[in-house]
Design a protein with these regions (language model features):
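Metal-cofactor-binding active-site regions of metalloenzymes
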Residues: 1-159, 166-172, 178-180, 185, ...
Length: 302
C-alpha cells in the first residue's frame, strides 16, 4: 500500500525472517517491519485484524500494548498512532469484545524520551488505560524511568512493565518494578520464582503475571511452564497470553493448547488460569463479575 521496501516481497519471505533465539534477535526483526505503518488507517487496520482474530479465539477482554516511540522516532505523529488504534478498539467494543490500550515506553531509549512521550500522550489518555515498559532490558532497569511512572500514576493510569525471562539482573528489576515503581502487574516476570520473598509479595498484593508460553519457547526449551505451575500453586495470579502472535506463530488458543499439552494440565488448571486473567484485568469489579460468570457458564455447559 505505502510502497515501503522492507527487504522481502512475499509473505513466505517475510515469515522466513522470523528466526529468533533471544530478545535481541526478535527486536531486530520487529522494529524494521513497523515501517509499513504510515497513516491512521494503517494502525486501525492492524489492530482491527488482531481483534478479529482474538474474538475468533474466544477472547472476551483484550488489553493491548503499543509502542508509540517506535513510530514517532520515524516521523509519525503520536495522535496518528493513538487515534488509529483507538478506532479499532471502539469497533471491537461494538462487536462485543471488551478492549483497551496500554502505552509502552521503549526502555532502550532515554528516560527523557519516555517522559516526552507521556506528556504528549496525556491529552489522549481517555484512549488508553495504562502504561508499560518493554524492549531491550539489558542495562535498562525500571528505575531508569521512575519519574515517568510517577507522573503516569499521578495521571490516574495503571502501571505494568516487562520483566523479560532470564535477563541479567531479572530479580533486581522485578523487585524495583514492584516495590519502587508501583507496578500492578509484571509482563512475563516468571523469574520471580527465584525469590520466595517476592513471590509472597506478589501474592499479598494481588500482582498479576502475564506469561506467554509460545514466545518463551523461542528462547527456552520449557516455555517457563514449570515456573507457571509453581507460581500458580503458590497463589500468584498468572495468566496465559499471546505475545506478538504474528511473529511467534500463535494466538491465545494456541498458547493455552501448547501449555496444556506440554505439561498435561487439567480443565481445572486451565480454568484457574482463565479466572486469573479476569481477576488481574484493569476493568471494573462489575465487569469482572460478569466475565467470571461467563467462565462459570462455559465450564458448566462444556
Amino acid at each position: 500500500k505505502n510502497g515501503v521496501d522492507i527487504g522481502q516481497s512475499t509473505v513466505e519471505e517475510v515469515q522466513a525472517t522470523y528466526q529468533f533465539n533471544d530478545l535481541t534477535s526478535f527486536l531486530a526483526v520487529y522494529y524494521p517491519a513497523m515501517d509499513v505503518l504510515q497513516d491512521e488507517d494503517d494502525f486501525h487496520d492492524l489492530a482491527a485484524a488482531y481483534f478479529e482474530r482474538a474474538r475468533a479465539n474466544g477472547v472476551v477482554r483484550a488489553e493491548c500494548f503499543f509502542d508509540p516511540q517506535a513510530h514517532t522516532s520515524r516521523g509519525i505523529a503520536i495522535e496518528t498512532v493513538i487515534r488509529g488504534y483507538h478506532r479499532a478498539v471502539v469497533e471491537a467494543r461494538e462487536a462485543g469484545l471488551s478492549a483497551d490500550l496500554i502505552l509502552c515506553f521503549l526502555r532502550d531509549m532515554s528516560a527523557e524520551s519516555a517522559l516526552e512521550t507521556l506528556q504528549v500522550a496525556l491529552p489522549y489518555k481517555d484512549m488508553f488505560i495504562g502504561v508499560g515498559l518493554d524492549s531491550d532490558e539489558r542495562d535498562n532497569p525500571p528505575t531508569k524511568f521512575a519519574d515517568v511512572f510517577a507522573l503516569a500514576r499521578e495521571a490516574g493510569l495503571h502501571v505494568t512493565m516487562h520483566c523479560d525471562i532470564d535477563q541479567i539482573g531479572s530479580i533486581d528489576n522485578i523487585r524495583a518494578a514492584l516495590t519502587e515503581l508501583g507496578a500492578e502487574r509484571l509482563d512475563h516476570g516468571t523469574n520471580i520464582v527465584e525469590d520466595p520473598e517476592l513471590v509472597a509479595y506478589a501474592c499479598d498484593h494481588g500482582i498479576g503475571l502475564t506469561s506467554c508460553p509460545l514466545s518463551n519457547s523461542f528462547v527456552t526449551e520449557e516455555m517457563k511452564g514449570k515456573e507457571i505451575i509453581e507460581l500458580t500453586a503458590a497463589g500468584v495470579k498468572v495468566s496465559l497470553n499471546s505475545d506478538d502472535p504474528a511473529y511467534f506463530g500463535g494466538y491465545i488458543g494456541d498458547n493455552y493448547l501448547a501449555f496444556a499439552e506440554r505439561f498435561d494440565r487439567s480443565r481445572a488448571d486451565l480454568e484457574r488460569i482463565a479466572r486469573n486473567s479476569i481477576e488481574i484485568a484493569w476493568i471494573s469489579e462489575e465487569e469482572k463479575a460478569e466475565l467470571l460468570a461467563r467462565v462459570d457458564r462455559f465450564v458448566s455447559e462444556n
